[in-house]
């Protein structure tokens, strides 16, 4: 990859005012659904946040891209029968992209910027070059949160036979392990099973999902649960039904090639819980804002809200909508998600 691509990214990072930006990095292999999750989150967010005195103002380019991706997801439902449109869906990402959203009170200038960074999943696999791998490491180190999409059928079916191949948990573990060396400030890690409609509509599967995530990411979770990492990192499971009315319907026995079906011929695009990762992010930010410690990181978080108590209350109200019952779970770091607690 040409050096100028990396230089451009670093210039963008330098230009953004860190006092106003919460950065979230996607982390997952190619084809796992990182961009689909972002598009679904953006679409659902506008519908959910209307109930709070908050407004989201996507930067124009980000809105255009995610809207186009949402249209492609909607096209999956354009057929008359149960088989989705096989030509629709989202193509693999070919380059990195930052999706920026400004958050503020309705009718006021935005005071907080959320930045979600997506990139080709191939940049974390064994064929990636040293520049790509270093790029991802730099991004993870500079991010306040990491969002890890998980292909749920690969995790859940046939005792997780295809999980390692599809979700690459060892690659995810190694990158986070390297990125969080000598960590000194809190971080949030969100494990987000997607394409999980079949399992969340079946009580037996639903109860099994948390256990399967913990088993499938046992190296990562074990590493984060010791010493200073345990004290600094919050880890949550937040599944997202990215389509709503399309479910996993099987795969050939000899390879992972999943087939999906609409739940009914007139099924429609109706994602569910796709705002939950953002609710957890805001809950994390609100907890840090309440912390009175004077270290640089906590000061930066407090400066994001600029003493706007009205915005703080509205953001806090939105953040308290986090789901915590199974299959949602806080695995560690509850203290970094307790918005009622004040630091010392």
Predicted regions and their residues:
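Conserved GTP-binding G-domain of TRAFAC-class P-loop NTPases and closely related GTPase folds
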Residues: 142-317
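Conserved G1/Walker A P-loop phosphate-binding module
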Residues: 2-116
